[in-house]
Amino acid sequence: MFDVFSVVGLLATGPVAPVVESESGSLLFKILGSIVVGAPVLLFVVLGIASLLRDRPLSERTIVSFVQFGIAAGLVAAVAMLIFMLAWNDTQVPIEFGSWVHVDHNHDDEADHYHFVFKFEFDRLSVPFVILTFVLCGTIGAFANRYLHRERGFNRFFVLFSLFVAGMVTTSLAGTVETLFSGWELVGLSSALLVAFFHERPAPPSNGLHVWIVYRVSDAALLMAAVALHHMKGEGNFDKFLTGEWPAGGTLLSPNSAFFVGLLLLIAAMGKSAMVPFSGWLPRAMEGPTPSSAVFYGALSVHLGAFLLLRFSPILEQSPTLQGLIVAVGLATAVFATFSAAVQTDIKSALSFASLSQVGLIFAEIGIGFRYLALIHILGHGCLRTLQFLRAPTLLYDYRTMEDAIGERLPKISGAWLSRSPDSVRVWYYRLALERGYMDAYLKDYLVRPFLWTLRKCDSFERRWTNMLTNSGPAKERAPEAAQNMRSFYE
């Protein structure tokens, strides 16, 4: 396949290319990589500490200045990293920041039983994705400055926003499964909190809880995959189970091990990217502010599951069954999102389902093996959907202005096949789309309720056993408050 990095690198190795010692190049890469990773982390630390100073809070102008400087520094360093990688024909640049955990075997010194290296990987996949993150987050930050002007939660929004940027950068550049999981958790936490941003109303916290529950399922699957990889290889460094450079790499795992780990990774990606049957949380996430809807669920966070599959694509390709499952999930999600978008009455929900249909196609491309096509699709779709979300608040005004200018109502566009269908088919289609394929009802009846019933039974048994051992009277048997809230949320 055509390799832009290699072609440009070969051109740069001519007589005009600078000759740089490897030590100097490594030092430069480490400095630039430290800026890319450290800028959003430092931004979060500064804004987080400042938010704790209630007596002297930062002004809106100061907060925006910090955000602009932090994102601009990270973007410049990422672009500089890309330029030097092209010029020196480096398609993979690992950067390590030391070993945080190091446990040896008791019987020999041949290998480590557990080895946690804080490592980042700059390659053909991570560099474009992290540049996209900085570009879109910078755009959203400038938009949010005006959109949230004089809002009560202005400072809170940008604290969570900086946490999201740090999580996205960490996940994108992760070179170990532990580093990836830490960034994955930061993205999920900031996303759920921003869905519940307007906590004065009952709907945003409830929808934020729904998003958090789905993310917990996704996080559990990713954690199980990380534990399995540690059990198989002794550490989470990608080099221990992935060979070669992306996208032409391979895996050192056996087919059975690859299928098990790949299935867990697929579940994690499905939850993060709202694939069927976890698609119900995406329209609920629109309760958050428009800037967070644009950057999270329209451009970046919703693509994180696809990025995870691209990163571990050599493992997925070990199993044709797993690849077929990815294609099936992606196509089913695309079809589901297409007919659900047709009945939405607000533009943000319609755009969320439009994003979901494209992410479903991206999953199908990954399952087929079109890795570069999937990456290009992510980059283009993220930019387009961000523009549409930012345009949404003024679209209705412009729509009415256009109707006033032409003196009549604009015609409504509907599917040609649907307009020619019998009334019974159209009613059935509308009901199915309005109920979102009844997926939420099925999940509630066949997954959530049995799960909560099991937990309540375990809680009741534990209370009886405790009362018997302590010879105390019968305590009031009830589920904990958190379980009660979860039950009322789903019922």
Tell where the protein language model's regions lie, with residue ranges.
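...captures the hydrophobic TM-helix bundle architecture rather than a specific catalytic motif
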Residues: F2-E491
